[in-house]
A protein has these predicted regions:
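Hydrophobic transmembrane alpha-helices and their immediate loop junctions
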Residues: 3, 8-218
Length: 218
């Protein structure tokens, strides 16, 4: 019975954590993109009301479903006008990286809180559930950062390619954006990406949890 309750509680906390990420963390991710673009001279997102914590300004139906199914996904990309950037390539790269960086910052905060609570939890069930929640929230944000750094349209990593690839090659790459996205969905559903994503997640997990583990000795 205790084992069944533990599994049930874990499943519920997983769903709650994913809802929290969808309605609280994804808006921060997209707001980070818009803010970075604004700081680079592009006010497009601000004019369109995308510099907002309102989740309904940012949610993408497919990306949201992916988070609930896989724990990874994406939001509606913040519109930018690279022509307004003070430095085109630098602006595109910084704007693209701002989103995943925000996820890593949030994951560190959640990891720190969860690790601290874990020291205090003892046999307190409510505290243990909070530790579980913050652990899930940290891990989902790590997964989102890793996933969005993949160089696949429309993910953030693909925008960084604008800095690396010649203009002609970059334009040709994005010509097949729709097909590349379909291929990505197939790879996710079939589990082909499970191992490489798990390796990357584990690497970032060790990095994020290094200081919390050092401080709290977990």
């Amino acid at each position: 019975m205790g084992s069944e309750m533990c599994i049930r509680d874990s499943a519920i906390i997983t769903i709650v954590a994913r809802m929290f990420v969808v309605f609280c963390c994804l808006p921060v991710h997209e707001l980070a993109h818009g803010w970075a673009a604004y700081k680079q001279g592009d006010d497009t997102a601000k004019k369109l009301g995308r510099l907002s914590f309102n989740p309904f300004s940012h949610l993408d139906p497919i990306g949201t479903i992916m988070i609930f199914l896989f724990g990874i996904g994406y939001a509606k990309p913040v519109p930018i006008n690279p022509l307004k950037f003070k430095n085109y390539r630098k602006g595109v790269a910084l704007t693209a990286l701002a989103g995943p960086l925000s996820n890593l910052v949030m994951s560190f905060i959640f990891a720190f809180i969860g690790s601290g609570l874990n020291r205090l939890a003892g046999a307190n069930t409510a505290m243990q559930l909070l530790v579980l929640f913050f652990g899930f929230a940290a891990n989902i944000n790590i997964a989102l950062a890793v996933f969005n750094l993949l160089p696949i349209p429309p993910l953030d990593g693909s925008r960084v390619l604008a800095v690396i690839l010649p203009d002609r090659a970059y334009e040709k790459y994005f010509r097949y954006e729709r097909y590349i996205m379909i291929a990505l969905m197939v790879l996710l559903f079939t589990g082909v990406l499970d191992t490489p994503l798990a390796l990357l997640n584990n690497l970032f997990h060790k990095f994020i949890y290094f200081l919390p583990n050092l401080v709290f000795g977990n």
